[in-house]
Swiss-Prot record:
It comes from the Eukaryota. InterPro entries: INSIG_fam (IPR025929). Belongs to the INSIG family. It is found in: Endoplasmic reticulum membrane. The modification Phosphoserine is found at S28. The chain crosses the membrane at residues 94-120, 135-159, 171-186, 190-215, 222-256, 261-281. The keyword Endoplasmic reticulum applies. It comes from Schizosaccharomyces pombe (strain 972 / ATCC 24843). Pfam families: INSIG. This is INSIG family protein.
Amino acid sequence: MSRKEIYEPRPRYPDGYNGNRAVKKSLSVLSLDNMKSTLSGLFAPLKLDEEQAEDDESLSSYEDYASRQIDDDLKKQRKKGITFIDYSSLITFFCKLCVIFGLGFVFTYLAEQIVQDAKLPLLTVNLKSWKFEPPWPAIFGFVAVILGLSYRRMDTKYPLGAAPLRPSQSSKWQWISRYLAAFATLLLSMKKLLFISNSHSIVALVASSASIWYIFDRSRNGIILSTITSVLGSILYYNLVDTSKIELNGVEFPEIQFRLWIPMILFSASTIVGNAGRLLF
């Protein structure tokens, strides 16, 4: 039987069907394309561990560099600001110290002039056989600075005993002028009391001290510090200063009068200077 006579069955397919081989071919092509797209979407090109470590190290080093730059810039800005503020504040603080020092210096200098006008000898320090006249204005100027700082420190540490009111910035110098007027009044009182009897002078100084405290202070901290200054100053005066043979207009001046004057004068002066320091600092 020849090949032509062999009957090959041909199955029937629906219209539009191109054959089983074409279908398989199209299905295989579609499946391959879908697989490629799926694989390309699911998997990205992988990096080695060394490459990943290098990338992480470079990123961290860049972040460290950026943070250091920011920190350096902030430090420079803070340093500039702090230097400027410190410089200006130091100048202001020094000027305030000079004002307080000047109050103590001027008051003591004028008090010495009053003593000289009354033809009284200047106070000398007696240490055994060594006698000398110290620069009282400069000494009391430094004492005034210590008092001014002590008043402000006391108010900060014990606010319940501080002064009731604190004046505004614009009225501070008005209060300083009032303190100067109080110093002048105290000096005039000293000058007049040199020619008054002992009992009257003590009463006048006590009244003057109480008035100065009531007008300029009225605080518990102020009266405590002024009292401490008065007591310590009086003790040093009694033990160190030589007041023997004091003569006023040829008549021997009683030493007891000076001894009773000193506490009241120190109390009044410390009240004025302390409140000036409380005002400025």
